Amino acid sequence: MTAQIINGKAIAEATLSETKSLIDKRLEKGLRAPTLAVILLGSDPASTIYVRNKRLACDKTGIRSLAYDLPDTTSEAELLALIKQLNQDDAVDGILVQSPLPAHIEEKKIIETISATKDVDGFHPYNIGRLAVRQPTLRSCTPYGVIKLLQSTGVRLLGLDAVVVGVSNHVGRPMALELLLAGCTVTSCHRHTKDLQASIARADIVVAAVGKPHLIKGEWIKPGAIVIDIGINRLADGSLCGDVEFDIAKTRAAWITPVPGGVGPMTVATLMQNTLTALELGESDQAPA
């Protein structure tokens, strides 16, 4: 068996095209396009690339992008003041603060200061809570993108055994909630899991999100499983790899995402969707009190 590759780039492009079409229809009706404020602190090379990709996606879809490129010496108080200003600006629909943040800034405080209605990353406790009670609005971008990748396979997800490796607040935990919402039976694995191999060996769906190169061995994969590799790791030779041992896993899985070119593009595409959703929710007055 050789797995079919889930082409995240192609699916992301289709998602961006769909979002652009919806925005174009708004403009035809005399309505405005969404606006996304993107805040970048410092000049970390990876963060700079991520922000550039997000701004390019705004250009593709017709979303207005506001750039706030600040020095990494920006104080927490200054960043919070900017966020509060953007929260009050009715012309701004989404606010994104690129992580990681400098050590002197508390990420939790930043996330919770962004208005839940403008939290297009889907990190705010309010939005995670809505997902937990099966009433999602602004969904965490990477997990939501993974669901779209899974749906692209045409495989019926209802009742499948899904294992999520990693329990981070931004990816692992909301990923488990998304899979529950899709009707899967979900197991979350972490550093205290006693037998990771046994959990993965019985999984119909494996989602890896830990950031450790080749943590998940290819021979652990159940024949016919779907493997989604969210991890992206740079090796000593400069090459990129995921959390899953791809070359062996692809001989056992039915479907698998590559690294790079799998999940990453979908994260950006769902961010654009969320920005449009935030505008529409604001217009329909479905915001939290």
Curated annotation (Swiss-Prot):
Keyword Oxidoreductase (UniProt): yes
InterPro entries hit by this protein: Aminoacid_DH-like_N_sf, NAD(P)-bd_dom_sf, THF_DH/CycHdrlase, THF_DH/CycHdrlase_cat_dom, THF_DH/CycHdrlase_CS, THF_DH/CycHdrlase_NAD-bd_dom
Pathway recorded for this protein: One-carbon metabolism; tetrahydrofolate interconversion
Keywords: Amino-acid biosynthesis, Histidine biosynthesis, Hydrolase, Methionine biosynthesis, Multifunctional enzyme, NADP, One-carbon metabolism, Oxidoreductase, Purine biosynthesis
GO MF assignments: methenyltetrahydrofolate cyclohydrolase activity; methylenetetrahydrofolate dehydrogenase (NADP+) activity
Biological process annotations from GO: L-histidine biosynthetic process; methionine biosynthetic process; purine nucleotide biosynthetic process; tetrahydrofolate interconversion
EC number: 1.5.1.5, 3.5.4.9
GO cellular component term of the entry, any: cytosol
Binding site for NADP(+): G166, V167, S168, I232
Catalytic activity: (6R)-5,10-methylene-5,6,7,8-tetrahydrofolate + NADP(+) = (6R)-5,10-methenyltetrahydrofolate + NADPH; (6R)-5,10-methenyltetrahydrofolate + H2O = (6R)-10-formyltetrahydrofolate + H(+)
Family of this protein: Belongs to the tetrahydrofolate dehydrogenase/cyclohydrolase family.
Summary of the function given for this chain in its UniProt record: Catalyzes the oxidation of 5,10-methylenetetrahydrofolate to 5,10-methenyltetrahydrofolate and then the hydrolysis of 5,10-methenyltetrahydrofolate to 10-formyltetrahydrofolate.
UniProt-recorded name of the protein: Bifunctional protein FolD
Organism: Methylobacillus flagellatus (strain ATCC 51484 / DSM 6875 / VKM B-1610 / KT)
